[in-house]
């Protein structure tokens, strides 16, 4: 290197800047694009980088000509030419080398090139060298391959061939770090190989970062294949190469807040800065500059301090409060306000007057309560409130402080007292003054904000701003933050967006790379958070915005969850009429009307067809019903209604009837009941809940809402008709679902036979579709039995039947073939404190009955375990029989005459399987139809229930029938009769002996044959009755005996009819006859499992013998929940657990 030093170092005697000035006349004017005195001083750049010993006049001339040549070379490279960009000087000798010894200069095509003299490994570094690099201005226009060039540096480094980052031919990198240049090889260079470099500036980050990191220059290109960008990210990534990596900060000197972007600072100055002036009108020529001067100059005489904002000036004025006037004012001076030409007589008055200009409440508008500093501004503002007032002129809008004052805030720091009068003299007219002042504001704002980035000059003007006071809800300028996506468009009208401040897309400048990367990362995090769910293309998408705006209530939420809660509970649109939108066609056009619970109705109105209409063609759709016990309570023993109960019942029933007359919020056409109605919940496309006025995006979400969260879950049960039921085939089977399991096997509608209508509570036909015109009107006292207890000292806890329990089929659902199913499917909230016993439970209930929730609603059998329940439903329940066998044909005799069988002791004996305890107590049927004979009338521990509650099923032929009426046990409370006066009426001797279970086998043919026989049971040696051979099972071949909870149950397979879910709850038939019970449950023997299959004859006999020998297990405590395996120490906690917390409610529709 020493032998290549400059041979004549003392050739340069004159200053470096003089040499450049001499050569400027010969250099083209484009030189200033690269070398500018304003960008960097020549003394600092050239004199320190090029010493006198290594710079000659020829080299200065070469460097001067280099600027134009580089611009031409850059354009050539943009056209695809990859040749070197620096034209060499043919007269330059190789002995002027100033670079490292491993390199040398050579001539190629008349240009100076740098090559290696020896083999160089990867990572060979030379430096540091003084120098400077800048953006290539031509590359921004022509998209050249070289975005950066060296504007100063050692001569040998300037001769290096430059290539773009994406070009894989480069073998070294020249970068700037700490204000110095370094050169490092990125590939192994062989001897004689040319150096091809690219430039990276690590200091100012003005580089093509994406080009460097995503190409083979520094990183392998195969990394691009593993990067998946969203469409929005790809668009943002396309502008990253030209984005500005912002390392500058933008402070607000008034508030002391630093902002990372100019946009944020501009918004702060316009809306949030404490030193801003909100509503100021244009001032006149003589005092227009004073409004600006007050924010920088102290108005006190002989005080030359200047401040950047009004807050600093206000704090400064406090220092003058204690100063006396004579200390301040020279002789002949006066205190004159520079804002309004007010002359004060004392310092105190002048001080108070100045504060009136600084406060916003000096002159306040009575209409909008905006404050103004001068009365003239207030008067001009009040013109806007005049109805016939003219709109503000464009010139007035240009003079508004939002255009001048706020834009001037950053620039006032650079203003001095001498500059302000010059700007005042330049304003001759009003329009000219506004234009000049605005332009000067913008220029000084740019000078203040971009003094560290001279290459960026945003060319904003007054058209970029909009100062119109328009209250609108625009879509966010940020694509990732607006609920109105630009590629979809809003589904609601949105006002025009008039930006109050300029955004980066409004300013012709390069966007900030930090904001682009922030938006890209925001998209990624939002995608990860919300997943790839499908949303309707209205407002929401998988890229959910951070916040949302309710346009009805004019509220913007920064959290989407808060917005959804608002729309569900608080939005005003929930109570307004809403039109159907094409996106959600199922939205009702009219909101459901509010129902008044005080609507008066009578007991006759409850039964008329106008209040209750049903659709016989659509069994799945039922209208409202009333409880059978309601009418009995209303009528009373003497035919007088109870006023208190009547008002309560009427309120509940009127609400339910009005509610159920509407299907999906639309009135039902009661004049034409034959028109089939569409079940809204069974519609797979339904997504709107009329009760809550919520439209869901998916039907599955809607179904979950209806099952767990709908407001109708908390309504009285009569308001929840069968139309609110979820279709059985649309729900998944759950093991703990006790009341809805049979829905999985419901037959099709066409398989259900027609139904014979029954009268309602023996009331004469009142033109109601629920009552039969062929039935005579009889007394209520002969049809129903009293509900009473015969245990001494035990009082029934709930004698009154509550309307909240709705297990029975009410009136107007009785004329459809699915009425009994609707009875069982009623969504009744479980209220154990008011739970009354069903018929089968009353037959077998003792004071220590077990509260169990695995109950077959068809057979009225409770189970202790889920496995027993499932085995019963799969193998033994009559409802499931149609899945294995064809439907049996209906018997000609629809309703048999069970009265003869009931009155025949012979039949009741032969059709019964008597189970005895070891004590030898025997029950025998009495000929008069009562429960006990006279010698058994004194037995203790027996509980009397009505015979109507014992009717679980009827004859085999009756299994084909679907009885339409379910009489609730409370319905017999008011009944009268001579027979019912007996304390033991309703209990047969074959039903109970010490809690043993007896199952009546009822076959109608055998009952007719045995009608005239009256055999008597004889006591055997073991104390049990001697049974006839044919009277023990007496089962048809298609039936099986099943041990259920310690008792026997008959199971009929082939002749079962699927429509017999409500047999167990029918207390009466035609001609007012009673049906004998054939099955009941025994909760005392509650731990035996259900037989999973059809037992053989031997198994049947052994099972019967086991029941006869009294092998039932002892009962467990009633305070133990088997489902949850929890033992409670008191009944109150147990009831609370069952009501609210038990796991049996997991599949229910109520809590």
From Swiss-Prot:
Cross-link (Glycyl lysine isopeptide (Lys-Gly) (interchain with G-Cter in SUMO1)): 324, 471, 915, 955
Name by which UniProt lists this protein: Zinc finger protein ZFPM2
Family per record: Belongs to the FOG (Friend of GATA) family.
Gene of this entry: ZFPM2
Biological processes annotated in GO: cell differentiation; embryonic organ development; fat cell differentiation; gonadal mesoderm development; heart development; in utero embryonic development; lung development; negative regulation of DNA-templated transcription
Composition bias type Polar residues, residue spans: 401-410, 419-431, 447-485, 647-658, 1057-1067
Organism: Homo sapiens
Zinc fingers typed C2H2-type, residue spans: 296-320, 335-357, 363-385
Pathological association: Tetralogy of Fallot: A congenital heart anomaly which consists of pulmonary stenosis, ventricular septal defect, dextroposition of the aorta (aorta is on the right side instead of the left) and hypertrophy of the right ventricle. In this condition, blood from both ventricles (oxygen-rich and oxygen-poor) is pumped into the body often causing cyanosis. Diaphragmatic hernia 3: A form of congenital diaphragmatic hernia, a posterolateral defect of the diaphragm, generally located on the left side, that permits the herniation of abdominal viscera into the thorax. The lungs are hypoplastic and have abnormal vessels that cause respiratory insufficiency and persistent pulmonary hypertension with high mortality. About one third of cases have cardiovascular malformations and lesser proportions have skeletal, neural, genitourinary, gastrointestinal or other defects.
Start and end residues of each stretch annotated as Interaction with CTBP2: 829-835
Function in brief: Transcription regulator that plays a central role in heart morphogenesis and development of coronary vessels from epicardium, by regulating genes that are essential during cardiogenesis. Essential cofactor that acts via the formation of a heterodimer with transcription factors of the GATA family GATA4, GATA5 and GATA6. Such heterodimer can both activate or repress transcriptional activity, depending on the cell and promoter context. Also required in gonadal differentiation, possibly be regulating expression of SRY. Probably acts a corepressor of NR2F2.
């Amino acid at each position: 290197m020493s032998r290549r030093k400059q041979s004549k170092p003392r050739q340069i005697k004159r200053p470096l800047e003089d040499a450049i000035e001499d050569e400027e006349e010969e250099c083209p004017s484009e030189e200033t694009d690269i070398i500018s005195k304003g960008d960097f001083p020549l003394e600092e750049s050239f004199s320190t980088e090029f010493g006198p010993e290594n710079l000659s006049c020829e080299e200065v001339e070469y460097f001067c000509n280099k600027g134009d040549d580089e611009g031409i070379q850059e354009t050539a490279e943009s056209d695809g030419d990859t040749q070197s960009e620096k034209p060499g000087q043919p007269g330059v000798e190789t002995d002027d080398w100033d670079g490292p010894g491993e390199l040398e200069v050579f001539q190629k095509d008349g240009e100076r090139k740098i090559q290696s003299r020896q083999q160089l490994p990867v990572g060979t570094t030379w430096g540091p060298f003084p120098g400077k690099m800048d953006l290539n201005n031509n590359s921004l226009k022509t998209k050249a391959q070289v975005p950066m060039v060296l504007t100063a540096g050692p001569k040998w480094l300037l001769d290096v061939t430059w290539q773009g980052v994406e070009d894989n031919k480069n073998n070294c990198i020249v970068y700037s770090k700490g204000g110095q240049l370094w050169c490092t090889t990125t590939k192994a260079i062989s001897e004689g190989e040319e150096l091809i470099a690219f430039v990276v500036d690590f200091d100012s980050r003005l580089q093509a970062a994406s080009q460097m990191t995503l190409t083979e220059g520094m990183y392998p290109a195969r990394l691009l294949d593993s990067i998946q960008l969203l469409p929005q990210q790809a668009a943002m990534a396309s502008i990253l190469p030209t984005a500005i990596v912002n390392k500058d900060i933008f402070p607000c000197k008034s508030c002391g807040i630093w902002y990372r972007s100019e946009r944020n600072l501009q918004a702060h100055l316009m809306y949030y800065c404490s030193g801003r002036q909100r509503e100021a009108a244009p001032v006149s020529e003589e005092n227009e500059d004073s409004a600006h001067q007050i924010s920088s100059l102290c108005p006190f005489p002989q005080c030359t301090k200047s401040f950047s904002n009004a807050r600093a000036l206000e704090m400064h004025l406090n220092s003058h409060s204690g100063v006396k006037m004579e200390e301040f004012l020279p002789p002949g001076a006066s205190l004159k306000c520079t804002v309004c030409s007010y002359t004060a007589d004392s310092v105190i008055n002048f001080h108070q007057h100045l504060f009136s200009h600084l406060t916003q409440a000096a002159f306040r508008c009575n209409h909008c309560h905006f404050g103004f500093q001068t009365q003239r501004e207030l008067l001009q503002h009040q013109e806007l409130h005049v109805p016939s007032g003219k709109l503000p002129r464009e010139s007035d809008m240009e003079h508004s402080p939002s255009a001048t004052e706020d834009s001037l805030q950053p620039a006032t720091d650079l203003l001095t007292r001498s500059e302000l009068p010059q700007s005042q003299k330049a304003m001759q007219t009003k329009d000219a003054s506004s234009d000049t002042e605005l332009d000067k504001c913008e220029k000084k704002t740019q000078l203040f904000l971009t003094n560290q980035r001279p290459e960026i000059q945003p060319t904003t003007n007054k058209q970029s701003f909009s100062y119109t006071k328009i209250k609108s809800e625009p879509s966010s300028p940020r694509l990732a933050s607006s609920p109105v996506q630009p590629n979809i468009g809003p589904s609601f009208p949105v006002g025009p967006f008039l930006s109050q401040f300029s955004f980066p897309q409004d300013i012709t400048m390069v966007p900030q790379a930090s904001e682009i990367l922030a938006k890209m990362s925001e998209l990624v995090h939002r995608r990860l958070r919300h997943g790839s769910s499908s949303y309707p293309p209205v407002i929401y998408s998988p890229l959910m915005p951070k916040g949302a705006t309710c346009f009805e209530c004019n509220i913007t939420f920064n959290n989407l969850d808060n917005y959804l809660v608002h729309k569900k509970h608080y939005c005003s649109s929930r109570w307004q009429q809403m039109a159907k939108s094409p996106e959600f066609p199922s939205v009702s056009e009219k909101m459901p009307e509010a129902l008044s619970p005080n609507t008066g109705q009578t007991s006759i109105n409850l039964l008329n067809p106008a209040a209750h209409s049903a659709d016989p063609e659509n069994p799945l759709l039922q209208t409202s019903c009333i409880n059978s016990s309601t009418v009995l309570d209303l009528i009373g023993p003497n035919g007088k209604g109870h006023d208190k109960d009547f008002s309560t019942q009427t309120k509940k029933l009127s609400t339910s009837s009005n509610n159920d007359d509407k299907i999906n919020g639309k009135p039902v056409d009661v004049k034409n009941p034959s028109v089939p109605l569409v079940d809204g919940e069974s519609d797979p496309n339904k997504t709107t809940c009329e009760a809550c006025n919520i439209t869901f995006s998916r039907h599955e979400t809607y179904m979950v809402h209806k099952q767990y969260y709908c407001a109708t879950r908390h309504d009285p049960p009569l308001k929840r008709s069968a139309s609110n039921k979820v279709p059985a085939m649309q729900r998944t089977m759950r093991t703990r679902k006790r009341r809805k399991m049979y829905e999985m096997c419901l037959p099709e509608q066409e398989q259900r036979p027609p139904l014979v209508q029954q009268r309602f509570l023996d009331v004469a036909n009142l033109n109601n579709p629920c009552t039969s015109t062929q039935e005579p009107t009889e007394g209520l006292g002969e049809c129903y039995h009293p509900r009473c207890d015969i245990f001494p000292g035990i009082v029934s806890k709930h004698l009154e039947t509550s309307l909240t329990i709705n297990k029975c089929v009410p009136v107007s659902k009785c004329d459809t073939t699915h009425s009994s199913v609707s009875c069982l499917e009623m969504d009744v909230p479980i209220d154990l404190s008011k739970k009354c016993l069903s018929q089968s439970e009353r037959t077998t209930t003792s004071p220590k009955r077990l509260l169990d929730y695995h109950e077959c609603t068809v057979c009225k059998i409770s189970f202790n375990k889920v496995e027993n329940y499932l085995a019963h439903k799969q193998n033994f329940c009559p409802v499931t029989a149609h899945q294995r066998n064809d439907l049996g044909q209906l018997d000609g005799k629809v309703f048999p005459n069970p009265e003869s069988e009931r009155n025949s002791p012979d039949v009741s004996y032969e059709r019964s399987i008597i189970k005895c305890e070891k004590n030898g107590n025997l029950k025998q049927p009495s000929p008069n139809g009562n429960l006990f004979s006279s010698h058994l009338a004194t037995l203790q521990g027996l509980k009397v229930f009505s015979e109507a509650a014992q009717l679980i099923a009827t004859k085999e032929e009756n299994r084909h029938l679907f009885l339409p009426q379910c009489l609730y046990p409370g319905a017999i409370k008011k009944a009268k009769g001579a027979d019912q006066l007996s304390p033991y009426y309703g209990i047969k001797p074959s039903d109970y002996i010490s809690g043993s279970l007896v199952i009546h086998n009822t076959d109608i043919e055998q009952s007719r044959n045995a009608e005239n026989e009256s055999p008597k049971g004889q006591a055997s040696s073991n104390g049990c009755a001697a049974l006839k051979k044919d009277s023990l099972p007496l089962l048809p071949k298609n039936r099986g005996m099943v041990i259920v909870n310690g008792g026997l149950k008959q199971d009929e397979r082939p002749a079962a009819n699927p429509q017999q879910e409500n047999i167990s709850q029918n207390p009466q038939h035609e001609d007012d006859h009673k049906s004998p019970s054939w099955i009941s449950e025994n909760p005392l023997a509650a731990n035996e499992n259900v037989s999973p299959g059809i037992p053989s004859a031997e198994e049947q006999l052994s099972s019967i013998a086991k029941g006869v020998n009294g092998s039932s297990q002892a009962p467990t405590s009633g305070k133990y929940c088997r489902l949850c395996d929890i033992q409670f120490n008191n009944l109150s906690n147990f009831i609370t657990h069952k009501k609210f917390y038990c796991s049996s409610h997991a599949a229910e529709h109520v809590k």
